[in-house]
Amino acid sequence: MPFLMIRNDITKVAADAIVNPANRNLLQGSGTSRAIYQAAGEQELTAACEAIGHCDLGRAVCTPAFGLPAKYIFHAVCPAWHGGFFGEAKQLAGAYHSALELAAEDHCESVAFPLLSSGNYGYPKEQAFRIAVDTITQYVMEHDLTVYLVLYDRARWP
């Protein structure tokens, strides 16, 4: 199935699911996370995340998308960059893979990802991009799913 890179605001992408770069407590973050919460409806999304409670690093959980065009939000818990010596690459690939697996479980035909960990988490964009491309490409070769990698602005392009 297709793997497409697009430049857009992820909150406006008409995919079955979008992915939120989350922290372990599933609390609203800054940047992309804040934009997703605001567009979905902060009160509803906060309540849904509080009901789940937490998620492990490199994993993802699902909530409704509320006010977004998507059906679901997959909250992927992403690693912060600590020099690459603490398993960050494996954790980041795991976050992508876990969200992709949720898409399959929820019978999604499409899912949209931001470039996870590349903003406030400080992951080098080129490395984050390579992990995203490798993980998504491997997955779509074996699964019937359209995946969008949504890059918000030219500065996000590695």
For every predicted segment, state its role:
Residues M1-D106:
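Glycine-/small-residue-enriched capping loops at alpha/beta junctions
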Residues A80-P158:
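Phosphate/ribose-phosphate-bearing ligand recognition and processing surfaces
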